[in-house]
From Swiss-Prot:
Keywords: Early protein, Glycoprotein. The keyword Ubl conjugation does not apply. This is Early E3 20.6 kDa glycoprotein. It comes from Human adenovirus B serotype 35. Glycans are attached at N30, N73, N117, N134, N135. The keyword Metal-binding does not apply. Belongs to the adenoviridae E3_20 family. InterPro entries: Adeno_E3_CR1, Adeno_E3_CR2. Disulfide bonds: none annotated. The lineage of its organism: Viruses, Varidnaviria, Bamfordvirae, Preplasmiviricota, Tectiliviricetes.
Length: 187
């Protein structure tokens, strides 16, 4: 029962791919994954074939300080999905490993100091800001990823339950002569 619950939990977590943070790391470097700000964080590594491990149980390869997970000397085998939770909140990472000869992807950083160099006129900027605010409000017609993951977990649970009941009904069907005498209504 515990393995089924764990499987359902990790299956529902796997459906949350759109909320996953993608990190690109080069081979030989160290990578620190920040955990939720709550209490003690439990980390899981989820493989493509459905297996999962606790990286904090592997000293020397990983370093856990109770909240963050550091992957020491990243190798090509460290690519994959890492999930950290304190059972109140969670963070999900997808680690992409590049060879050390490949330059890291170019990142662009925006800062608040760029507002002084604004070339957009005030009315245009106000219209653009209004349009952005109107478009960024959440629509009531979209379904959040957490709702989809809960629905997926419930569907899998119900299908396992139906399969178990069907299996029991087909394989353990009692004959007429083997029935419980208290449940027979023969008079």
């Amino acid at each position: 029962m515990v393995s089924t619950t764990t499987f359902l939990m990790l299956t529902s977590l796997a459906t949350l791919t759109s909320a996953r943070s993608h990190l690109t790391v080069t081979i030989g470097s160290n990578c620190t994954l920040k955990g939720p700000q709550g209490g003690h964080v439990f980390w899981w590594r989820i493989y493509d074939n459905g297996w999962f491990t606790k990286p904090c149980d592997q000293p020397g390869r990983f370093f856990c300080n109770g909240r963050d997970l550091t992957i020491i000397n990243v190798t090509a085998n460290d690519k994959g999905f890492y999930y950290g939770t304190d059972y109140k909140s969670s963070l999900d990472y997808n680690i992409i490993v590049l060879p050390s000869t490949t330059p890291p992807p170019r990142t662009t950083t925006f800062s608040s100091s760029s507002v002084a160099n604004n070339t957009i006129s005030n009315p245009t900027f106000a219209a653009l800001l209004k349009r952005t605010v109107n478009n960024s409000t959440t629509s009531h017609t979209t379904i959040s990823t957490s709702t989809i993951s809960i629905i997926a977990a419930v569907t899998i649970g119900i299908s396992i339950l139906v399969f178990t009941i069907t299996y029991y009904a087909c394989c353990y069907r009692k004959d007429k002569h083997k029935g419980d005498p208290l449940l027979r209504f023969d008079i």
